[in-house]
Amino acid sequence: MKAERPDGRKLRALKRGHLAEYRAALCLIVKGYRIVAMRYRTKLGEIDIIARRGDLIACVEVKARASFDGAVFAVSDTAQRRIRAASDVWLSRQADFHCLSVRYDIVAVMPWRWPRHLPDAF
């Protein structure tokens, strides 16, 4: 059985998504966060970026859209549940999990603009 190769449209979307994640990570670094993980995957879900500033862990969903509102509303309830489930798995594997506080953020990446960070989005 052969592995499927993504067609051109899917490949462009994948590249655009990865570029958006790197732009979002740069935005967070400038704001004083340390990137702990990118594209953290579990059977329960995926977190685009896990960032840390002190004892705060930010589980960040990155959305590349034409507008800020479009990016924020693109994070469905199902996606939020999956991100929370994946963060529970990640936190359970941290030695200092008991002293960490967790927040769920969105970074909207729009064309020709600096990424916009929405802390405590859900």
UniProtKB/Swiss-Prot annotation:
GO molecular function: nucleic acid binding
PANTHER family: UPF0102 PROTEIN YRAN (PTHR34039:SF1)
Gene3D superfamilies given in the database record: 3.40.1350.10
Lineage, broadest ranks: Bacteria, Pseudomonadati, Pseudomonadota, Alphaproteobacteria, Hyphomicrobiales
InterPro entries hit by this protein: Restrct_endonuc-II-like (IPR011335), tRNA_endonuc-like_dom_sf (IPR011856), UPF0102_YraN-like (IPR003509)
Family: Belongs to the UPF0102 family.
Listed name of the protein: UPF0102 protein NGR_c36770
